[in-house]
């Protein structure tokens, strides 16, 4: 994914069975730590919010007051500067990615995807996902935000 290359193309119809019994057991054991994981993600997301608030609507996820919001992703509205921002972050050894790809772009669907999707085309070049995981520390998020600011100014 990094660097704008597409490493996850779908070229034929098939099945995606990837979870093993071991993976399931690890997932079940992780449930014991779920509240701690959620709290850490909320804390890191709040750092992103406060560090990037000068850019207004840069962060796409919003939490309503009174909701128990736990972010899965930190998605930015790059305002058309996605590739430049990705390149800048990569130079600074910071991972970023579009994450979700449109189904009509996969090779397997090329015979069926001959339609125009102007709204999706407009959105596609404007979003980018930043790191958010439990191994991140607050100082990492602050560094990421500093680099985002440098790239978008």
Give the predicted meaning of each segment.
Residues 1-153:
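PLP-dependent aminotransferase class I/II
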């Amino acid at each position: 994914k990094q660097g704008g290359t597409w490493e996850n193309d779908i070229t034929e119809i098939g099945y995606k069975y990837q979870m093993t019994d071991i993976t399931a057991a690890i997932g079940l054991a992780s449930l014991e730590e779920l509240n701690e994981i959620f709290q850490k993600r909320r804390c890191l997301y709040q750092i992103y919010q406060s560090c990037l608030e000068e850019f207004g609507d840069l962060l796409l996820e919003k939490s309503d007051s009174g909701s128990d919001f736990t972010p899965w992703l930190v998605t930015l509205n790059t305002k058309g500067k996605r590739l430049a921002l990705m390149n800048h972050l990569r130079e600074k050894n910071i991972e970023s990615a579009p994450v979700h790809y449109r189904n009509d772009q996969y090779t397997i669907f090329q015979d069926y995807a001959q339609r125009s999707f102007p709204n999706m085309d407009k959105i596609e070049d404007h979003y980018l996902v930043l790191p958010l995981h439990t191994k991140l520390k607050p100082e990492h998020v602050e560094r990421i935000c500093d680099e985002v600011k440098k790239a978008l100014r």
